[in-house]
Regions:
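Signature of N-terminal electron-transfer/Fe-S-associated modules in redox systems
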Residues: 1-162
Length: 162
């Protein structure tokens, strides 16, 4: 089945079974390997991408659900260079093994898009299903706060209003 979608701002057409997980299309057909396979059951968050701006687990999202949609992977989060979250991750030395980080950052980006100034409780709720084997959760929270401040400082007046 031919499925058309937009990935990281680029229109693509893929040939895949409708029920193939979006993760495998992203990694195997589009060669975007920043999105990781962790559990295959939507439990760890390593495969998190954005589908029309919402964070989804690509390991359980059939590619047919992405037909005509906009998909953003970690590679497309900031076409101009490093995203504020990526810079904050480095500043706070979040990554140890790094395997979960793409999914963590994508989940955090979805949170900040909806909640520009999240509280610790909001961060914990939004991030509680993204697992980090190295347990860098306090640094993840600190990095999200830092990125929120950076994004707020660089927002235009119209963006700040709403």
């Amino acid at each position: 089945m031919s499925i058309s979608l937009t990935v990281n701002g680029k229109a693509v057409s893929v040939d895949a079974p409708a029920d193939m997980p979006l993760l495998w299309v992203i990694r195997e057909q589009l060669d975007l390997v920043g999105t990781k396979f962790g559990c295959g059951r939507s439990q760890c968050g390593a495969c998190t991408v954005h589908l029309n701006g919402a964070a989804v687990r690509s390991c359980v999202t059939p590619v047919s659900r992405a037909a005509g949609a906009n998909v953003t992977t970690i590679e497309g989060l900031s076409p101009e260079g490093s995203h504020a979250l990526q810079r904050a991750w480095i500043e706070h030395d979040v990554a140890q093994c790094g395997y979960c980080q793409g999914g963590q950052i994508m989940a955090a980006a979805a949170l900040l898009a909806k909640t520009p100034h999240p509280t610790d409780a909001q961060i914990d709720t939004a991030m509680n299903t993204n697992l980090c084997r190295c347990s860098t959760y306090p640094r993840i929270r600190a990095a999200i706060h830092t990125a929120a401040k950076t994004l707020s400082a660089s927002a235009t007046p119209a963006q700040k209003e709403g």
